[in-house]
Amino acid sequence: MSLTLEQVKRIAHLARIEISDDEALTTQGHLNGIFQLIEQMQAVDTTGIEPMAHAQDVSQRLREDAVSEGDRRAAYQAVAPEIEAGLYLVPKVIE
């Protein structure tokens, strides 16, 4: 798969990116290079190879979840300008 110059310009337009002809040509080359790499990767025969989640088979040592602070909701809401029913009230910014 490869992109034409017109397709690159259309994608830039849809993304609301202003792009010159030189930049579009450079971007076309970069994107087509990425697509070629993807095609090469898809051409590799991976039958019989088990998918892996990580490059190295290492497990993490995890600690137990423990509460490190108590409930401080009342202290935080005591300094809030406005609260109602336990919720913070903020000014309306979208009409």
Curated annotation (Swiss-Prot):
<dbReference type="GO" id="GO:0006412">
    <property type="term" value="P:translation"/>
</dbReference>
<protein>
    <recommendedName>
        <fullName>Aspartyl/glutamyl-tRNA(Asn/Gln) amidotransferase subunit C</fullName>
        <ecNumber>6.3.5.-</ecNumber>
    </recommendedName>
</protein>
<dbReference type="GO" id="GO:0070681">
    <property type="term" value="P:glutaminyl-tRNAGln biosynthesis via transamidation"/>
</dbReference>
<dbReference type="InterPro" id="IPR003837">
    <property type="entry name" value="GatC"/>
</dbReference>
<dbReference type="GO" id="GO:0005524">
    <property type="term" value="F:ATP binding"/>
</dbReference>
<keyword id="KW-0547">Nucleotide-binding</keyword>
<dbReference type="GO" id="GO:0050567">
    <property type="term" value="F:glutaminyl-tRNA synthase (glutamine-hydrolyzing) activity"/>
</dbReference>
<dbReference type="InterPro" id="IPR036113">
    <property type="entry name" value="Asp/Glu-ADT_sf_sub_c"/>
</dbReference>
<dbReference type="GO" id="GO:0050566">
    <property type="term" value="F:asparaginyl-tRNA synthase (glutamine-hydrolyzing) activity"/>
</dbReference>
<comment type="similarity">
    <text>Belongs to the GatC family.</text>
</comment>
<keyword id="KW-0648">Protein biosynthesis</keyword>
<dbReference type="GO" id="GO:0006450">
    <property type="term" value="P:regulation of translational fidelity"/>
</dbReference>
<comment type="subunit">
    <text>Heterotrimer of A, B and C subunits.</text>
</comment>
<dbReference type="Pfam" id="PF02686">
    <property type="entry name" value="GatC"/>
</dbReference>
<keyword id="KW-0067">ATP-binding</keyword>
<keyword id="KW-0436">Ligase</keyword>
<comment type="function">
    <text>Allows the formation of correctly charged Asn-tRNA(Asn) or Gln-tRNA(Gln) through the transamidation of misacylated Asp-tRNA(Asn) or Glu-tRNA(Gln) in organisms which lack either or both of asparaginyl-tRNA or glutaminyl-tRNA synthetases. The reaction takes place in the presence of glutamine and ATP through an activated phospho-Asp-tRNA(Asn) or phospho-Glu-tRNA(Gln).</text>
</comment>
